[in-house]
Protein backbone atom coordinates (compact mmCIF):
# COMPACT_ATOMS: atom_id res chain seq x y z
CA UNK A 1 0.00 0.00 0.00
CA UNK A 2 1.41 3.40 -0.93
CA UNK A 3 0.40 6.67 0.66
CA UNK A 4 -0.30 9.36 -1.86
CA UNK A 5 1.58 12.51 -0.92
CA UNK A 6 4.20 13.41 -3.50
CA UNK A 7 7.74 14.64 -2.81
CA UNK A 8 9.37 17.36 -4.84
CA UNK A 9 11.54 14.82 -6.61
CA UNK A 10 8.96 12.00 -6.55
CA UNK A 11 11.85 9.67 -5.97
CA UNK A 12 11.46 8.01 -2.58
CA UNK A 13 9.60 4.75 -2.11
CA UNK A 14 9.64 2.53 0.97
CA UNK A 15 8.73 -1.12 0.40
CA UNK A 16 7.91 -3.49 3.23
CA UNK A 17 8.53 -7.23 3.45
CA UNK A 18 5.89 -8.83 1.29
CA UNK A 19 4.24 -12.20 0.70
CA UNK A 20 5.41 -13.46 -2.67
CA UNK A 21 1.92 -13.54 -4.11
CA UNK A 22 0.63 -10.25 -2.73
CA UNK A 23 3.35 -7.60 -2.51
CA UNK A 24 2.58 -4.00 -1.61
CA UNK A 25 4.45 -0.79 -0.86
CA UNK A 26 4.13 0.61 2.63
CA UNK A 27 2.73 3.98 3.59
CA UNK A 28 5.28 6.59 2.62
CA UNK A 29 5.23 10.29 1.85
CA UNK A 30 6.22 9.92 -1.77
CA UNK A 31 6.26 7.73 -4.84
CA UNK A 32 8.80 6.63 -7.40
CA UNK A 33 7.39 6.37 -10.92
CA UNK A 34 10.30 4.12 -11.84
CA UNK A 35 9.69 1.74 -8.95
CA UNK A 36 5.93 1.41 -9.07
CA UNK A 37 3.40 0.61 -11.73
CA UNK A 38 1.40 3.64 -12.92
CA UNK A 39 -2.20 3.87 -11.86
CA UNK A 40 -4.72 2.63 -14.37
CA UNK A 41 -6.13 5.28 -16.67
CA UNK A 42 -9.33 6.72 -15.28
CA UNK A 43 -12.56 6.35 -17.21
CA UNK A 44 -13.88 9.41 -19.08
CA UNK A 45 -15.40 11.92 -16.70
CA UNK A 46 -19.20 11.70 -16.62
CA UNK A 47 -21.63 14.59 -16.39
CA UNK A 48 -22.19 13.67 -12.74
CA UNK A 49 -18.45 13.85 -12.10
CA UNK A 50 -18.29 17.28 -13.72
CA UNK A 51 -21.12 18.49 -11.51
CA UNK A 52 -19.47 17.12 -8.36
CA UNK A 53 -16.12 18.65 -9.31
CA UNK A 54 -17.57 22.09 -10.03
CA UNK A 55 -19.40 22.08 -6.70
CA UNK A 56 -16.36 20.92 -4.75
CA UNK A 57 -13.66 22.93 -6.52
CA UNK A 58 -13.89 25.99 -4.22
CA UNK A 59 -13.28 23.71 -1.22
CA UNK A 60 -10.14 22.00 -2.54
CA UNK A 61 -6.61 22.94 -1.53
CA UNK A 62 -3.17 21.66 -2.27
CA UNK A 63 -1.07 21.36 0.90
CA UNK A 64 2.63 22.03 0.54
CA UNK A 65 5.38 21.36 3.04
CA UNK A 66 8.10 23.95 2.43
CA UNK A 67 11.53 24.54 3.89
CA UNK A 68 11.73 27.43 6.33
CA UNK A 69 13.34 30.49 4.86
CA UNK A 70 12.90 29.42 1.26
CA UNK A 71 10.30 28.63 -1.39
CA UNK A 72 11.38 25.03 -1.99
CA UNK A 73 8.71 22.43 -1.24
CA UNK A 74 9.60 19.01 0.16
CA UNK A 75 6.23 17.31 -0.31
CA UNK A 76 2.74 18.02 -1.56
CA UNK A 77 -0.66 16.56 -0.85
CA UNK A 78 -4.31 17.56 -0.94
CA UNK A 79 -6.95 18.70 1.53
CA UNK A 80 -10.42 20.20 1.74
CA UNK A 81 -12.28 22.83 3.73
CA UNK A 82 -14.82 21.58 6.28
CA UNK A 83 -15.89 24.79 8.06
CA UNK A 84 -16.20 28.43 7.13
CA UNK A 85 -13.78 29.19 9.97
CA UNK A 86 -10.96 27.76 7.88
CA UNK A 87 -10.68 24.18 9.16
CA UNK A 88 -9.09 21.84 6.63
CA UNK A 89 -8.85 18.03 6.71
CA UNK A 90 -5.96 16.08 5.20
CA UNK A 91 -3.79 13.04 5.97
CA UNK A 92 -1.22 12.96 8.76
CA UNK A 93 1.40 11.66 6.35
CA UNK A 94 0.87 14.76 4.18
CA UNK A 95 1.88 17.09 7.04
CA UNK A 96 4.15 14.75 9.02
CA UNK A 97 7.38 16.61 8.20
CA UNK A 98 5.94 19.88 9.51
CA UNK A 99 4.34 18.14 12.51
CA UNK A 100 7.51 16.32 13.59
CA UNK A 101 10.14 18.82 12.44
CA UNK A 102 8.47 22.24 12.72
CA UNK A 103 11.84 23.93 13.16
CA UNK A 104 12.66 22.99 9.56
CA UNK A 105 9.31 23.04 7.76
CA UNK A 106 6.25 25.22 7.26
CA UNK A 107 2.85 24.41 5.77
CA UNK A 108 1.04 26.43 3.14
CA UNK A 109 -2.12 25.82 1.16
CA UNK A 110 -2.82 26.71 -2.45
CA UNK A 111 -6.40 27.01 -3.69
CA UNK A 112 -7.71 25.88 -7.06
CA UNK A 113 -7.55 29.49 -8.27
CA UNK A 114 -3.95 29.99 -7.11
CA UNK A 115 -4.26 31.75 -3.75
CA UNK A 116 -1.57 30.75 -1.24
CA UNK A 117 -1.37 31.26 2.53
CA UNK A 118 0.04 29.57 5.68
CA UNK A 119 -1.52 26.73 7.69
CA UNK A 120 -1.34 25.65 11.32
CA UNK A 121 -1.91 22.15 12.74
CA UNK A 122 -4.69 21.82 15.33
CA UNK A 123 -5.15 18.09 15.88
CA UNK A 124 -3.75 14.75 14.70
CA UNK A 125 -5.24 11.28 14.39
CA UNK A 126 -2.15 9.23 13.66
CA UNK A 127 -3.95 5.88 13.88
CA UNK A 128 -6.32 6.78 11.04
CA UNK A 129 -3.77 8.95 9.20
CA UNK A 130 -5.69 12.22 9.54
CA UNK A 131 -4.81 15.80 10.44
CA UNK A 132 -6.95 18.85 11.15
CA UNK A 133 -5.48 22.16 10.00
CA UNK A 134 -6.62 25.76 9.98
CA UNK A 135 -5.85 28.50 7.56
CA UNK A 136 -3.52 30.58 9.71
CA UNK A 137 -4.20 33.82 7.89
CA UNK A 138 -7.83 33.66 7.05
CA UNK A 139 -10.37 33.22 9.83
CA UNK A 140 -12.34 36.35 8.99
CA UNK A 141 -11.79 36.25 5.19
CA UNK A 142 -12.88 32.61 5.03
CA UNK A 143 -16.08 33.26 6.91
CA UNK A 144 -16.76 36.29 4.75
CA UNK A 145 -16.05 34.44 1.52
CA UNK A 146 -18.29 31.53 2.45
CA UNK A 147 -21.11 33.83 3.42
CA UNK A 148 -20.80 36.40 0.67
CA UNK A 149 -18.48 35.56 -2.19
CA UNK A 150 -20.58 32.65 -3.40
CA UNK A 151 -23.74 34.76 -3.53
CA UNK A 152 -22.01 37.50 -5.52
CA UNK A 153 -20.35 35.13 -8.01
CA UNK A 154 -21.92 34.56 -11.39
CA UNK A 155 -24.49 31.78 -11.30
CA UNK A 156 -24.59 31.51 -7.50
CA UNK A 157 -27.94 30.81 -5.90
CA UNK A 158 -27.41 30.47 -2.14
CA UNK A 159 -24.62 30.76 0.39
CA UNK A 160 -23.21 28.05 2.62
CA UNK A 161 -23.86 28.40 6.33
CA UNK A 162 -20.80 29.01 8.49
CA UNK A 163 -21.47 26.20 10.94
CA UNK A 164 -19.40 23.36 12.29
CA UNK A 165 -19.69 20.17 10.29
CA UNK A 166 -21.62 17.28 11.84
CA UNK A 167 -22.63 13.84 10.59
CA UNK A 168 -26.10 15.18 9.87
CA UNK A 169 -25.04 18.34 8.00
CA UNK A 170 -27.26 19.48 5.14
CA UNK A 171 -26.15 18.30 1.73
CA UNK A 172 -23.79 20.32 -0.44
CA UNK A 173 -25.64 19.88 -3.70
CA UNK A 174 -28.53 22.12 -2.68
CA UNK A 175 -26.31 24.85 -1.27
CA UNK A 176 -23.44 25.16 -3.73
CA UNK A 177 -23.91 26.26 -7.31
CA UNK A 178 -21.43 25.30 -10.00
CA UNK A 179 -18.18 27.25 -9.97
CA UNK A 180 -15.95 27.96 -12.94
CA UNK A 181 -12.39 29.10 -13.45
CA UNK A 182 -13.72 32.17 -15.20
CA UNK A 183 -15.61 33.24 -12.10
CA UNK A 184 -13.69 31.95 -9.07
CA UNK A 185 -15.56 31.90 -5.81
CA UNK A 186 -14.49 31.95 -2.19
CA UNK A 187 -13.85 28.91 -0.05
CA UNK A 188 -16.96 26.82 0.59
CA UNK A 189 -16.89 24.05 3.19
CA UNK A 190 -17.89 20.55 2.20
CA UNK A 191 -20.49 18.63 4.21
CA UNK A 192 -20.23 15.03 5.32
CA UNK A 193 -22.68 12.35 4.24
CA UNK A 194 -25.18 11.72 7.07
CA UNK A 195 -24.50 8.60 9.10
CA UNK A 196 -28.12 7.60 8.53
CA UNK A 197 -27.32 7.06 4.82
CA UNK A 198 -24.71 4.25 4.64
CA UNK A 199 -23.05 3.61 1.31
CA UNK A 200 -24.23 0.63 -0.73
CA UNK A 201 -21.91 -1.82 -2.48
CA UNK A 202 -21.26 -0.57 -6.00
CA UNK A 203 -22.37 3.00 -5.28
CA UNK A 204 -20.52 5.56 -7.36
CA UNK A 205 -18.08 7.85 -5.57
CA UNK A 206 -15.59 10.45 -6.73
CA UNK A 207 -12.08 11.15 -5.50
CA UNK A 208 -10.60 14.65 -5.81
CA UNK A 209 -7.07 15.93 -5.35
CA UNK A 210 -3.97 17.31 -7.01
CA UNK A 211 -2.02 14.34 -8.43
CA UNK A 212 1.72 14.73 -8.91
CA UNK A 213 1.43 18.52 -8.49
CA UNK A 214 -0.05 18.92 -11.98
CA UNK A 215 -3.47 20.35 -11.07
CA UNK A 216 -6.76 19.49 -9.40
CA UNK A 217 -8.67 16.58 -10.84
CA UNK A 218 -11.49 14.13 -10.18
CA UNK A 219 -11.51 10.36 -10.61
CA UNK A 220 -14.63 8.24 -10.68
CA UNK A 221 -14.92 4.84 -9.01
CA UNK A 222 -17.10 2.61 -6.87
CA UNK A 223 -17.61 1.83 -3.21
CA UNK A 224 -16.64 -1.78 -2.55
CA UNK A 225 -17.25 -2.02 1.16
CA UNK A 226 -14.67 -2.04 3.94
CA UNK A 227 -11.27 -3.65 3.52
CA UNK A 228 -11.09 -7.15 4.93
CA UNK A 229 -8.53 -7.84 7.66
CA UNK A 230 -7.75 -4.18 8.25
CA UNK A 231 -7.14 -3.43 11.94
CA UNK A 232 -8.86 -0.06 11.49
CA UNK A 233 -11.75 0.48 9.06
CA UNK A 234 -10.79 1.56 5.54
CA UNK A 235 -12.96 1.89 2.45
CA UNK A 236 -12.04 -0.15 -0.62
CA UNK A 237 -12.34 2.38 -3.48
CA UNK A 238 -12.49 0.88 -6.96
CA UNK A 239 -10.86 3.84 -8.69
CA UNK A 240 -7.49 5.29 -9.59
CA UNK A 241 -5.51 7.41 -7.13
CA UNK A 242 -2.09 8.94 -7.71
CA UNK A 243 0.67 10.43 -5.56
CA UNK A 244 -0.32 13.92 -4.43
CA UNK A 245 -4.01 13.06 -3.97
CA UNK A 246 -3.56 12.03 -0.31
CA UNK A 247 -5.87 14.00 1.94
CA UNK A 248 -8.32 14.93 -0.79
CA UNK A 249 -12.03 14.19 -0.36
CA UNK A 250 -14.04 11.32 -1.80
CA UNK A 251 -17.61 12.42 -2.50
CA UNK A 252 -20.93 10.85 -3.35
CA UNK A 253 -23.26 12.02 -6.14
CA UNK A 254 -24.64 14.75 -3.90
CA UNK A 255 -21.22 16.14 -3.05
CA UNK A 256 -21.12 14.75 0.49
CA UNK A 257 -17.76 13.64 1.88
CA UNK A 258 -17.72 9.86 2.37
CA UNK A 259 -13.98 9.36 2.82
CA UNK A 260 -10.47 10.78 2.57
CA UNK A 261 -7.92 9.55 0.02
CA UNK A 262 -5.09 7.74 1.78
CA UNK A 263 -3.37 4.99 -0.24
CA UNK A 264 -3.39 2.65 -3.21
CA UNK A 265 -1.95 -0.74 -4.04
CA UNK A 266 0.97 -0.63 -6.46
CA UNK A 267 0.58 -4.24 -7.54
CA UNK A 268 -2.96 -3.86 -8.88
CA UNK A 269 -5.12 -1.51 -10.90
CA UNK A 270 -7.80 0.72 -9.34
CA UNK A 271 -7.31 -0.80 -5.88
CA UNK A 272 -7.34 2.25 -3.65
CA UNK A 273 -8.21 3.07 -0.06
CA UNK A 274 -10.07 5.80 1.80
CA UNK A 275 -10.33 6.72 5.47
CA UNK A 276 -14.06 6.63 6.35
CA UNK A 277 -15.52 10.10 6.89
CA UNK A 278 -16.64 9.27 10.44
CA UNK A 279 -13.06 9.60 11.68
CA UNK A 280 -12.70 13.06 10.13
CA UNK A 281 -15.98 14.07 11.78
CA UNK A 282 -14.64 12.95 15.15
CA UNK A 283 -11.33 14.71 14.58
CA UNK A 284 -13.12 17.95 13.74
CA UNK A 285 -15.29 17.71 16.85
CA UNK A 286 -12.23 17.20 19.07
CA UNK A 287 -9.97 19.75 17.45
CA UNK A 288 -11.95 22.61 15.94
CA UNK A 289 -11.43 24.84 19.00
CA UNK A 290 -7.91 23.61 19.82
CA UNK A 291 -4.89 25.88 19.93
CA UNK A 292 -2.26 25.26 17.23
CA UNK A 293 0.27 22.54 18.01
CA UNK A 294 3.58 24.15 18.93
CA UNK A 295 6.81 22.19 18.67
CA UNK A 296 7.42 18.61 17.48
CA UNK A 297 4.34 16.41 17.83
CA UNK A 298 6.16 13.29 19.01
CA UNK A 299 4.34 13.42 22.35
CA UNK A 300 0.97 13.28 20.59
CA UNK A 301 2.18 10.48 18.32
CA UNK A 302 3.53 8.52 21.30
CA UNK A 303 0.27 8.84 23.23
CA UNK A 304 -1.80 7.56 20.32
CA UNK A 305 0.62 4.72 19.59
CA UNK A 306 0.35 3.69 23.25
CA UNK A 307 -3.40 3.29 22.78
CA UNK A 308 -2.85 1.35 19.57
CA UNK A 309 -0.30 -1.08 20.98
CA UNK A 310 -2.49 -1.86 23.98
CA UNK A 311 -5.47 -2.70 21.76
CA UNK A 312 -3.28 -4.63 19.32
CA UNK A 313 -1.69 -6.75 22.05
CA UNK A 314 -5.04 -7.60 23.64
CA UNK A 315 -6.68 -8.54 20.34
CA UNK A 316 -3.71 -10.56 19.12
CA UNK A 317 -3.46 -12.65 22.28
CA UNK A 318 -7.23 -13.10 22.57
CA UNK A 319 -7.59 -14.57 19.07
CA UNK A 320 -5.38 -17.58 19.86
CA UNK A 321 -3.73 -19.80 17.26
CA UNK A 322 -4.88 -21.98 14.38
CA UNK A 323 -4.85 -25.74 14.70
CA UNK A 324 -1.49 -27.39 14.04
CA UNK A 325 -0.62 -28.13 10.41
CA UNK A 326 2.88 -29.54 10.97
CA UNK A 327 2.92 -33.34 11.43
CA UNK A 328 5.29 -33.20 14.43
CA UNK A 329 4.94 -29.80 16.13
CA UNK A 330 2.30 -27.28 17.08
CA UNK A 331 3.64 -24.18 15.32
CA UNK A 332 2.09 -20.74 16.06
CA UNK A 333 0.03 -19.53 13.09
CA UNK A 334 -2.57 -16.78 13.75
CA UNK A 335 -6.14 -16.83 12.41
CA UNK A 336 -6.85 -14.49 9.51
CA UNK A 337 -8.88 -11.97 11.50
CA UNK A 338 -6.59 -8.98 10.87
CA UNK A 339 -3.61 -10.77 9.34
CA UNK A 340 -3.11 -12.69 6.11
CA UNK A 341 -0.79 -15.65 5.66
CA UNK A 342 1.03 -16.96 2.60
CA UNK A 343 2.96 -20.15 2.09
CA UNK A 344 5.68 -21.42 -0.24
CA UNK A 345 7.56 -24.69 -0.55
CA UNK A 346 10.80 -25.69 -2.23
CA UNK A 347 11.96 -29.21 -2.96
CA UNK A 348 15.66 -29.54 -3.73
CA UNK A 349 16.38 -31.24 -7.04
CA UNK A 350 20.06 -31.71 -6.23
CA UNK A 351 19.80 -33.69 -3.02
CA UNK A 352 19.87 -30.63 -0.79
CA UNK A 353 17.54 -29.08 1.77
CA UNK A 354 13.75 -29.19 1.34
CA UNK A 355 11.67 -26.58 3.16
CA UNK A 356 8.21 -25.08 3.52
CA UNK A 357 7.64 -21.49 4.57
CA UNK A 358 4.61 -19.69 6.00
CA UNK A 359 4.53 -15.93 6.56
CA UNK A 360 1.77 -13.89 8.20
CA UNK A 361 1.52 -10.09 8.23
CA UNK A 362 -0.87 -7.33 9.13
CA UNK A 363 -1.89 -4.96 6.35
CA UNK A 364 -2.13 -2.15 8.91
CA UNK A 365 0.97 -0.09 9.70
CA UNK A 366 1.04 3.26 11.46
CA UNK A 367 2.94 5.97 9.58
CA UNK A 368 5.38 7.97 11.75
CA UNK A 369 7.32 10.34 9.53
CA UNK A 370 10.23 8.41 8.06
CA UNK A 371 9.08 4.94 9.06
CA UNK A 372 6.06 2.83 10.00
CA UNK A 373 5.31 0.94 13.20
CA UNK A 374 2.45 -0.60 15.16
CA UNK A 375 2.30 -3.94 13.35
CA UNK A 376 2.90 -7.65 13.95
CA UNK A 377 4.38 -10.27 11.63
CA UNK A 378 5.50 -13.86 12.06
CA UNK A 379 6.75 -16.73 9.99
CA UNK A 380 8.01 -20.27 10.28
CA UNK A 381 10.09 -22.53 8.06
CA UNK A 382 10.03 -26.32 8.16
CA UNK A 383 13.29 -27.98 7.07
CA UNK A 384 13.85 -31.54 5.85
CA UNK A 385 17.53 -32.41 5.55
CA UNK A 386 17.25 -36.18 5.21
CA UNK A 387 19.04 -35.96 1.84
CA UNK A 388 21.97 -34.14 3.47
CA UNK A 389 22.74 -36.25 6.50
CA UNK A 390 23.09 -34.99 10.11
CA UNK A 391 26.36 -33.04 9.79
CA UNK A 392 25.50 -31.11 6.63
CA UNK A 393 21.95 -30.49 7.86
CA UNK A 394 23.22 -29.12 11.19
CA UNK A 395 25.52 -26.69 9.36
CA UNK A 396 22.76 -25.44 7.04
CA UNK A 397 20.19 -25.26 9.83
CA UNK A 398 22.51 -23.27 12.09
CA UNK A 399 23.49 -20.92 9.27
CA UNK A 400 19.85 -20.15 8.57
CA UNK A 401 19.37 -19.26 12.24
CA UNK A 402 22.44 -16.98 12.25
CA UNK A 403 21.38 -15.16 9.07
CA UNK A 404 18.57 -13.31 10.84
CA UNK A 405 19.00 -9.55 11.30
CA UNK A 406 17.45 -7.53 14.11
CA UNK A 407 18.26 -4.00 12.85
CA UNK A 408 15.20 -2.36 11.30
CA UNK A 409 15.62 1.42 11.52
CA UNK A 410 18.61 3.78 11.26
CA UNK A 411 20.44 4.83 14.40
CA UNK A 412 18.74 8.24 14.56
CA UNK A 413 15.40 6.51 15.17
CA UNK A 414 16.18 3.39 17.17
CA UNK A 415 18.78 1.90 19.51
CA UNK A 416 20.87 -1.12 18.65
CA UNK A 417 19.17 -4.43 19.47
CA UNK A 418 19.80 -5.98 22.87
CA UNK A 419 19.36 -9.74 22.76
CA UNK A 420 19.15 -12.68 25.14
CA UNK A 421 19.69 -16.24 23.93
CA UNK A 422 18.74 -19.36 25.85
CA UNK A 423 17.79 -23.01 25.48
CA UNK A 424 14.28 -23.61 26.73
CA UNK A 425 11.95 -26.57 27.13
CA UNK A 426 8.32 -26.40 26.04
CA UNK A 427 6.41 -29.46 27.21
CA UNK A 428 9.45 -31.64 26.55
CA UNK A 429 10.27 -29.95 23.22
CA UNK A 430 13.83 -28.48 23.30
CA UNK A 431 14.11 -25.04 21.70
CA UNK A 432 16.85 -22.55 21.01
CA UNK A 433 15.38 -19.06 21.51
CA UNK A 434 16.65 -15.52 21.00
CA UNK A 435 14.67 -12.46 22.16
CA UNK A 436 15.82 -9.01 20.96
CA UNK A 437 14.45 -5.57 21.78
CA UNK A 438 15.08 -2.14 20.28
CA UNK A 439 13.94 1.16 21.80
CA UNK A 440 12.62 4.14 19.85
CA UNK A 441 14.65 7.26 20.54
CA UNK A 442 11.84 9.80 20.06
CA UNK A 443 9.05 7.52 21.29
CA UNK A 444 10.66 6.56 24.60
CA UNK A 445 7.99 4.17 25.87
CA UNK A 446 7.85 2.03 22.73
CA UNK A 447 9.95 -0.90 21.55
CA UNK A 448 10.30 -3.40 18.75
CA UNK A 449 10.59 -7.01 19.89
CA UNK A 450 11.80 -9.99 17.84
CA UNK A 451 11.72 -13.64 18.87
CA UNK A 452 13.70 -16.28 16.97
CA UNK A 453 13.08 -19.96 17.71
CA UNK A 454 14.53 -23.26 16.44
CA UNK A 455 13.52 -26.80 17.40
CA UNK A 456 16.43 -29.06 18.40
CA UNK A 457 14.97 -32.54 18.82
CA UNK A 458 15.72 -34.04 15.37
CA UNK A 459 19.15 -34.55 13.70
CA UNK A 460 17.91 -34.10 10.10
CA UNK A 461 14.79 -31.92 10.36
CA UNK A 462 13.42 -28.99 12.31
CA UNK A 463 11.30 -25.86 12.41
CA UNK A 464 12.50 -22.28 12.79
CA UNK A 465 10.12 -19.47 13.62
CA UNK A 466 10.29 -15.70 13.93
CA UNK A 467 7.91 -13.25 15.58
CA UNK A 468 8.13 -9.43 15.30
CA UNK A 469 6.02 -6.79 17.03
CA UNK A 470 6.73 -3.13 16.31
CA UNK A 471 5.89 -0.20 18.54
CA UNK A 472 4.76 -1.94 21.75
CA UNK A 473 5.39 -1.19 25.42
CA UNK A 474 8.09 -3.06 27.33
CA UNK A 475 5.51 -5.03 29.27
CA UNK A 476 3.53 -5.97 26.18
CA UNK A 477 6.72 -6.92 24.35
CA UNK A 478 7.43 -9.44 27.10
CA UNK A 479 3.85 -10.66 27.07
CA UNK A 480 3.81 -11.17 23.29
CA UNK A 481 7.19 -12.93 23.31
CA UNK A 482 5.98 -15.36 25.98
CA UNK A 483 2.71 -15.93 24.12
CA UNK A 484 4.65 -16.88 21.00
CA UNK A 485 7.12 -19.18 22.77
CA UNK A 486 4.34 -20.95 24.66
CA UNK A 487 2.68 -21.91 21.37
CA UNK A 488 5.46 -24.33 20.36
CA UNK A 489 4.43 -27.83 21.42
CA UNK A 490 4.46 -31.45 20.39
CA UNK A 491 1.54 -32.67 18.30
CA UNK A 492 -0.24 -35.24 20.47
Predicted features along the sequence, with ranges:
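Bacterial N-terminal signal peptides
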Residues: 1-8
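N-terminal activation segment of mature serine protease catalytic domains
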Residues: 14-78, 290-344
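Active-site substrate-binding loop(s) of clan PA
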Residues: 52, 98-99, 120-122, 138-152, ...
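Active-site region of chymotrypsin-like
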Residues: 56-72, 136-148, 181-191, 214-285, ...
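Catalytic-histidine neighborhood of serine endopeptidases
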Residues: 83-130, 137-138, 174-179
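Surface-exposed amphipathic alpha-helical segments
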Residues: 281, 291, 337-339, 459-492
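Secretory pathway targeting signatures of secreted, lumenal, and periplasmic proteins
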Residues: 339-394
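Signature of long, low-cysteine stretches enriched in small and polar/charged residues
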Residues: 395-456
Amino acid sequence: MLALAASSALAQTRVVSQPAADSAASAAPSQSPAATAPAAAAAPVSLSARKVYEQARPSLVQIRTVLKGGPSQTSVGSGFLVTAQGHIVTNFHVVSEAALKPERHDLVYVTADGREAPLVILQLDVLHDLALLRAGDALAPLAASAAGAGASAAGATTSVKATSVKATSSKVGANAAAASSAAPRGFEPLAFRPASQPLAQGERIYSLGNPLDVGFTITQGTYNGLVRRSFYPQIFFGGALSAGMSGGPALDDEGHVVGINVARRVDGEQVSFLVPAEFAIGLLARGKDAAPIIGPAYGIVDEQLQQHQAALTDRFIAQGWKEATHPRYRVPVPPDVFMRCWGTSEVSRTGGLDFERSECQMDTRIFVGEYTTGTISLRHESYDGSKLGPLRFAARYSQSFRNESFIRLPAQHQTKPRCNEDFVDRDGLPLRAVVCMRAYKKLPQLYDVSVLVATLDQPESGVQGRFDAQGVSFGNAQKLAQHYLDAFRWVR
